[in-house]
């Protein structure tokens, strides 16, 4: 998919192996994840560090892969109508639906890495669906998977230089995970084209610890927990969905969803070099409740030209109880005016009320114009208006011109806007201070917004498809840790920083697609992304560390009716590190390290043994092009003890090597 990469929330390299989906360089926090059109927001329960990173796997793994019917990705202006968190784009995971006849499946998958220091995966899942009566049908699926953690010393020999008390520390590899989930759906078609769905889903993800900490340092507790479960995420959703359609062409989609996340993990430090490292062997649980009510109706009508208007409203409420992130002591740094030193509330919440309208107007047989408008009122950040305008123009039988512009937005997180969330640094994390400082939440933050623009030309003839798109996002009010103090403690010794809005940033690039029907049995599909600019205009630094270009290519051959073969290639361009350290000074030495371009190839084959049984086998990373994590992006340490962990630049993640895999799929 063009425009899509994996990256972290910032350029820090912290939690470097917890890469998530990034669309058009806007970062994972601006990628809205939906499951069957409903938001999945469990990652929001994970504490946001000083640099914006979260120790999370994201929200894309709550559905077993074999239960996914398709994945829809919206990019640019088209995503703006989805509101909060969709400034980069939307990933909608569509699950398999109920069936009119009784059907079931049982699937298994395993892989074997060539290198024993890389974690292997085993996975199994099942599904069952069918009718209960003329009007009632059901669907049930579940899965279990286990991925082992990488070896604790997988990056031995590749780490950046480390001295003093850090001499024997290593950046961690990829952590493992045990994933269990089940999903039940009861569908009632109570009248013609009128359906009411009742759904319950439960998921549990527990990690297998690989030794990672926010600053890649260690202690005895870190070492003793390697391979053990140190955090677990429970996600439960209850949903009711009403879909209706009438012979007039009017249709409606309405749902209510309650999502509860319990995020349980070992207690972590909140100060300086100990931020994100285990503080003791006790567990804390953060509870996030997310309630969403959504209603929309689409009405076709003729007023000069055929049109379809969509009108809708949405209500979202988030409530979080987080007893662990409001516990930073003020004994050393001094008291912060207006904030309780010892008894800060663990509760935070936000509400969003939304109205939206969109009109698809068929101006001519070859011209479709789609204006739209969304209004959001956030209980903390206030009002936001998001207008949009998209045009699709056929240029003869072979070409289509597409263009669009929209204002997208993202509200502050419950950590960024919570004044009781306090972090502390003795100096290295303080952008403009010579001594210690605090970072506290800010309830006066504005919502982030982005003016997203694109224009593209597409050629299509039979199964041929070629296209190129230019996109530009003018990003405003991005929320980051402040660059200048806004006050001092009551003793006047410690500066106070807040989360603040950064005035301007720009992301722009090119996307291309080329699909070639080589023959009746061979297809060659390609896409590419080239980043022209990705810059915070206030600091001059990059917004995220992503490849300069990415090219994906897939060659598929249906050799016989029962046998298919596939070859894949992904070519990643150069990845440049951040330009400036936390003090705003130019990076030096190994902090300037780049990741050179590299290519990952894959081969696979699927054979249908019978109409109900198929087997797939293949090799990922055929030529064993591995990448090793050297550390976090920039140098940190203690001049008094001469203990340093030198910066790794862009070398902040692991790319696994050659891996053999096999899957068996059965169905009836």
Label each region the model flagged.
Residues 1, 19-22, 34-36, 58-61, ...:
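N-terminal periplasmic accessory domains that precede
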Residues 2-43:
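Extracytoplasmic beta-strand/coil segments of soluble accessory domains associated
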Residues 187-205, 227-383, 392-396, 467, ...:
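Face-selective signature of the C-terminal outer-membrane beta-barrel domain
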């Amino acid at each position: 998919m063009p425009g899509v990469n994996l990256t972290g929330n910032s350029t820090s390299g912290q939690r470097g192996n917890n890469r998530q989906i990034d669309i058009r360089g806007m970062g994972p926090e601006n990628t809205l994840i939906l499951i069957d059109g409903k938001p999945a927001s469990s990652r929001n329960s994970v504490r946001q560090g000083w640099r914006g990173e979260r120790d999370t796997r994201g929200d894309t793994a709550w559905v077993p892969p074999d239960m996914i019917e398709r994945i829809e990705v919206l990019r640019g202006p088209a995503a703006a109508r989805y509101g909060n968190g969709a400034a980069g784009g939307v990933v909608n995971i569509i699950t398999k639906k109920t069936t009119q006849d009784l059907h079931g499946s049982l699937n298994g998958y395993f892989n074997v890495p060539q290198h024993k220091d890389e974690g292997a995966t085993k996975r199994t899942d099942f599904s069952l669906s069918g009718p209960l009566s003329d009007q009632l049908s059901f669907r049930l699926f579940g899965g279990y998977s286990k991925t082992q953690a990488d070896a604790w010393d997988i990056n031995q020999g590749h780490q950046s230089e480390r001295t003093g008390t850090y001499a024997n520390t290593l950046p961690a590899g990829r952590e493992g995970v045990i994933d269990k989930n089940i999903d039940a759906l009861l569908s009632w078609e109570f009248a013609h084209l009128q359906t009411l769905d009742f759904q319950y889903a439960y998921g549990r993800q527990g990690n297998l610890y690989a030794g990672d900490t926010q600053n890649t340092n260690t202690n005895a507790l870190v070492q003793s927990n390697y391979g053990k479960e140190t955090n677990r995420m429970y996600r439960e959703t209850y949903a009711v969905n009403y879909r209706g359609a009438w012979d007039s062409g009017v249709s409606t989609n309405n749902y209510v969803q309650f999502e509860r996340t319990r995020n349980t993990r070992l207690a972590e430090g909140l100060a300086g070099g100990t931020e994100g490292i285990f503080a003791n062997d006790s567990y804390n649980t953060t509870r996030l409740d997310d309630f969403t009510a959504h209603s929309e109706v689409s009405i076709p009508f003729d007023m000069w030209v055929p049109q379809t208007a969509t009108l809708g409203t949405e209500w979202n409420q988030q409530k979080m109880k987080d007893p662990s992130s409001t516990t930073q002591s003020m004994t050393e740094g001094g008291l912060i005016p207006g904030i309780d030193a010892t008894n800060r509330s663990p509760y935070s919440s936000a509400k969003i009320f939304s109205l939206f309208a969109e009109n698809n107007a068929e101006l001519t047989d070859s011209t479709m114009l789609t204006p739209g408008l969304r209004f959001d009122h956030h209980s903390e950040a206030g009002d936001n208006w998001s207008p949009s305008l998209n045009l699709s123009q056929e240029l003869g039988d072979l070409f289509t011109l597409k263009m669009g512009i929209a204002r997208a937005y993202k509200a502050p997180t419950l950590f960024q806007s919570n004044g009781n969330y306090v972090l502390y640094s003795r100096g290295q994390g303080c952008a403009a201070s010579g001594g210690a400082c605090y970072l506290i939440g800010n309830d006066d933050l504005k919502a982030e917004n982005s003016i997203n623009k694109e224009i593209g030309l597409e050629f299509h003839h039979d199964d041929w498809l070629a296209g190129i798109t230019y996109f530009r996002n003018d990003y405003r009010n991005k929320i980051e840790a402040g660059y200048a103090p806004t006050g001092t403690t009551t003793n006047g010794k410690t500066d106070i920083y807040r989360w603040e809005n950064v005035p301007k940033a720009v992301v722009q690039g090119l996307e291309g697609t080329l699909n070639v029907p080589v023959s009746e049995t061979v297809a060659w599909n390609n896409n590419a992304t080239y980043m022209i600019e990705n810059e915070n205009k206030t600091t001059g630094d990059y917004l995220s560390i992503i490849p300069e270009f990415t090219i994906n290519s897939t060659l598929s051959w249906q050799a016989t009716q029962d046998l298919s073969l596939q070859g894949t290639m992904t070519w990643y361009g150069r990845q440049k590190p951040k330009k400036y350290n936390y003090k705003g000074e130019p990076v030096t030495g190994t902090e300037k390290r780049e990741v050179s371009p590299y290519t990952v190839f894959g081969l696979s084959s699927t054979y249908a043994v019978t109409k109900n049984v198929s087997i797939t086998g293949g090799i990922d990373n055929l030529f064993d092009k591995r990448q090793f994590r050297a550390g976090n992006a920039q140098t940190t340490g203690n001049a008094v003890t001469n203990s340093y962990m030198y910066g790794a630049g862009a070398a902040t993640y692991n790319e696994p090597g050659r891996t053999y895999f096999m899957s068996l799929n059965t169905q009836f």
